[in-house]
Amino acid sequence: MARFTLPRDLYHGEGSLAELKNLKGKKAVVVVGGGSMKRFGFLQKVEDYLKEAGMEVALFEGVEPDPSVETVMKGAKLMQEFGPDWIVAIGGGSPIDAAKAMWAFYEYPDTKFEDLITPFNFPTLRTKAKFCAIPSTSGTATEVTAFSVITDYHKGIKYPLADFNITPDVAIVDPELAETMPQKLTANTGMDAMTHAIEAYVSTLHCDYTDPLALHAIKMIHTYLVKSYNGDKEARARMHNAQCLAGMAFSNALLGIVHSMAHKTGAAFSTGHIPHGCANAIYLPYVIKYNAKDPVAAERYAEIARRMGLEGTCQQALINSLCEKIDEFNVRLNIPKTLKDFGIQEEEFKEKVAKIAELAVGDACTGSNPRAIDPANMEKLLTCTDYGTEVDF
């Protein structure tokens, strides 16, 4: 038996933010990030619509990129004091991810963060509040997923939290919010979405329900990502939809080792944080070459290439074309090809790679990767992504 879970309601299209005024409740906590939603007037619209719905509103502002355990606990404390029956998160993946974790600690104040790390081990939610997610970036798709990523900066580890309980009740996918994304964010989030769709399609848990979503998302991203990066308004709107479709796919099919590697390297190096989408973009072609040694995965990668209209007279040629296309995207989006190009220092990489490999193998996303991997091969794969060497194992 398998399960397929989505938000109960998804409102999409220009102006769909106004659906907030139709929510039924008494109190709402709005969780938001660094200030762009306030600067562009969207936060005020959210507050106004919720008040029009008859709700008292409290704000939790300042969620940082890659939210920390400490931020989650502060937000949960505000919720415990205010007592909302709606949690509304607006912004990129970070405030929505943070709000999902806050939700668990609001409803179960005695829960420890360590209790939530085990996949699909959350307590039953919605005893106090429902959840509405409003994305402003076109990548994470956390508005429709059962996932959240929280960082423990003391340990230098990103923890993917996974449970169908944290799939939002309502998602509002309004393309007006995505029009404000800067180019670099458009690039990173767009390649995050592409990675979601590709990993979902080759996952060991893919099914008839997830495959069409993943393939259509890939086709849309292939068509619209570079145009969106260059500021095309229609392409921005289509990318906002495409990333959401990719999220529906991976929330139910799960992911693979591209994400395992990104989770465990994002906060690992002293030279600076690697943005999640950027890490995914770097690792994706290397992982495709590793996974394509599995015959089932190889055929599914070839099918992706066919759907994208790429050239290739045989399966291997199609897989090569897919990897070349991803490399081309990264060049056009100004994303580095290797960790070394990103700026990771060689000595620190060598010092930490064995431990990172061990942690990546233990990541929640590794279990649904189409080809098994052990710490030794993970270390070799990470080394390829640092030096740009061929994956021949």
Where are these regions (language model features)?
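Flexible, glycine/charged-enriched surface loops at secondary-structure junctions
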Residues: 204-213, 227-238, 253-258, 274-277, ...
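Glycine/threonine-rich beta-strand-loop-alpha-helix active-site module
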Residues: 70-176
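ATP/NTP phosphate-donor binding region
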Residues: 1-86, 339-340
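Glycine-rich phosphate/pyrophosphate-binding beta-alpha loops
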Residues: 139, 244-280, 363-368
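Gly/Pro-rich interdomain helix-loop hinge
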Residues: 268-271, 277-351, 391-392
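Short, amphipathic C-terminal "tail helix"
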Residues: 348-393
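Carboxylate- and glycine-rich phosphate/diphosphate-binding segment that chelates Mg2+/Mn2+
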Residues: 147-253, 376
